[in-house]
Curated annotation (Swiss-Prot):
This is Glycoprotein. Disulfide bonds join 43-302, 54-226, 80-113, 178-188, 208-247, 242-271, 363-370. The gene is G. It comes from the Viruses. Arg-352 is highly involved in rabies virus pathogenicity. Its mutation dramatically attenuates the virus. The keyword Disulfide bond applies. Residues 481-524 are intravirion. Primary surface antigen capable of inducing and reacting with virus-neutralizing antibodies. Almost all human and veterinary vaccines are based on the functional aspects of the G protein. Glycosylated and palmitoylated by host. Glycosylation is crucial for glycoprotein export at the cell surface. It comes from Rabies virus (strain ERA). Its main location: virion. It is a single-pass type I membrane protein. Belongs to the lyssavirus glycoprotein family. Gene3D superfamilies: 2.30.29.130.
Length: 524
């Protein structure tokens, strides 16, 4: 069995290999065969693609996903709720004060929320003072309302950032998603009209810290860039790449699913909306390092096989298999026809499954048709077995299969799995149990005289007061009339008493009071 890296081809230039790593390279185009001497044999350089003459290598820097980049990009933020706290006091006739606190809501403005958050983060003492409820005022026989507008800051409130469309995902958002957060709109609406969500960092792009700068070698032909050798030493082709933005950064999605940002003059189409990229983690890096090491080892094996051919002056099908180009592109093909060593110019393409080149028994598909054999011999060590089956020295690599499974399982979902938004803020005021209040202004409202009675009691009291006043007026008028009648009678009696005199039998004149008194005494 050929080592695992032999079957791993990092260059994906064939459209059918979209997002997959090939397990083999087969001839796509084959030139005429010509006999050669064993001294014309050579080992291919599988670390550099000699495709379309792109042999000019130059150092350059590019940007890729960070190693260890996780699936969910967490973005810290806070929620801001507008709350109006109302303290209502009533002072009754005897001076007893009753205080009632009420709470209402209003929709805050982003600027006010940002200022309140900065107060809290800066440790401004005014923020601590603003956390208190409004101090209630009171007046005798009056209802006094003291109101304070508050900005309730709940921090932190973490949301998941989708790197593809820069949308945010959290249970606090309507339908669990917030789109369009940018410089012009720095907040998200939530499940409540009076609450908004804002990122802690107003510059959303800085929160998407998933990129790193790397150094590599660019393979170009004139002004056209064919591919590049990455920092791990593995060549990556730009054929089949498409443009894709991650967190607002424009880059290229390569055929193998990796994402890079690099300057190129090539005209590239945009990726389909459902196109994803592969994660860049330690496991994929480790496999890539193993592949590079294996490719280097395979070249050493090829050189050993070539040395053995030169030494023994003999060639076998097994030794010829070492001379096969392991990456897509232009190269050489070798075979042995009638004990004659043959060579041909060839172009290799990648193969995703063995069924692509082995559709049926005895058929080796090359260029869309079954390739003819010469006395059971094809090329690059491929022969026809005694049972009629095509025998390929290389078998599918377990390392490659592991890498393919890694790619299939490490893609970023466009929609993050989130809990049901209806489970958040069921009663509307649950968030207020964990609030931090920013209270800017206090407003007082003083009512008129209030006796503290309900509406029907007020009407009864007014009716009783009016009836009492009417009775008092009638009583006063009656008293006044009686006084006016008694005053003339008293005046006449007082005038007669001063002028009348009584002459007793003794001839002594006495006053009427004395005569009345004496007469009384006489009657006794």
């Amino acid at each position: 069995m050929v080592p695992q890296a032999l079957l791993f081809v990092p260059l994906l230039v064939f459209p059918l290999c979209f997002g997959k790593f090939p397990i083999y390279t087969i001839l796509d185009k084959l030139g005429p065969w010509s006999p050669i001497d064993i001294h014309h044999l050579s080992c291919p350089n599988n670390l550099v693609v000699e495709d379309e003459g792109c042999t000019n290598l130059s150092g350059f820097s590019y940007m890729e996903l960070k190693v260890g980049y996780i699936l969910a990009i967490k973005m810290n933020g806070f929620t801001c709720t507008g709350v109006v706290t109302e303290a209502e006091t009533y002072t009754n006739f005897v001076g007893y004060v009753t205080t009632t606190f009420k709470r209402k809501h209003f929709r805050p403005t982003p600027d006010a929320c940002r200022a309140a958050y900065n107060w809290k983060m800066a440790g401004d003492p005014r923020y601590e003072e603003s956390l208190h409820n409004p101090y209630p005022d009171y007046r005798w026989l009056r209802t006094v309302k003291t109101t304070k507008e508050s900005l309730v800051i709940i921090s932190p409130s973490v949301a998941d950032l989708d790197p593809y469309d820069r949308s945010l995902h959290s249970r606090v958002f309507p339908s669990g998603k917030c789109s369009g957060v940018a410089v012009s709109s720095t907040y998200c609406s939530t499940n409540h009209d009076y609450t908004i969500w804002m990122p802690e960092n107003p510059r959303l792009g800085m929160s998407c810290d998933i990129f790193t700068n790397s150094r590599g070698k660019r393979a170009s032909k004139g002004s056209e860039t064919c591919g590049f050798v990455d920092e791990r030493g593995l060549y990556k082709s730009l054929k089949g790449a498409c443009k894709l933005k991650l967190c607002g950064v424009l880059g290229l999605r390569l055929m193998d699913g990796t994402w890079v940002a690099m300057q190129t003059s090539n005209e590239t189409k945009w990726c389909p909306p459902d196109q994803l990229v592969n994660l860049h983690d330690f496991r994929s890096d480790e496999i890539e390092h193993l592949v590079v090491e294996e490719l280097v080892r395979k070249r050493e094996e090829c050189l050993d096989a070539l040395e053995s051919i030169m030494t023994t002056k003999s060639v076998s099908f097994r030794r010829l298999s070492h001379l096969r180009k392991l990456v897509p592109g232009f190269g050489k093909a070798y075979t042995i026809f009638n004990k004659t060593l043959m060579e041909a110019d060839a172009h290799y393409k990648s193969v995703r499954t063995w069924n692509e080149i082995l559709p049926s028994k005895g058929c080796l598909r090359v260029g869309g048709r079954c390739h003819p054999h010469v006395n059971g011999v094809f090329f690059n060590g491929i022969i026809l077995g005694p049972d009629g089956n095509v025998l390929i020295p290389e078998m599918q690599s377990s390392l490659l299969q592991q890498h393919m499974e890694l790619l299939e399982s490490s893609v970023i979902p466009l929609v993050h799995p989130l809990a049901d938004p209806s489970t958040v803020f069921k009663d509307g005021d649950e968030a207020e149990d964990f609030v931090e209040v920013h209270l800017p202004d206090v407003h007082n409202q003083v009512s008129g005289v209030d006796l503290g009675l309900p509406n029907w009691g007020k009407y009864v009291l007014l009716s009783a007061g009016a009836l009492t006043a009417l009775m008092l007026i009638i009583f006063l008028m009656t008293c006044c009339r009686r006084v006016n009648r008694s005053e003339p009678t008293q005046h006449n009696l007082r005038g007669t008493g001063r002028e009348v005199s009584v002459t007793p039998q003794s001839g002594k004149i006495i006053s009427s009071w004395e005569s009345h008194k004496s007469g009384g005494e006489t009657r006794l």
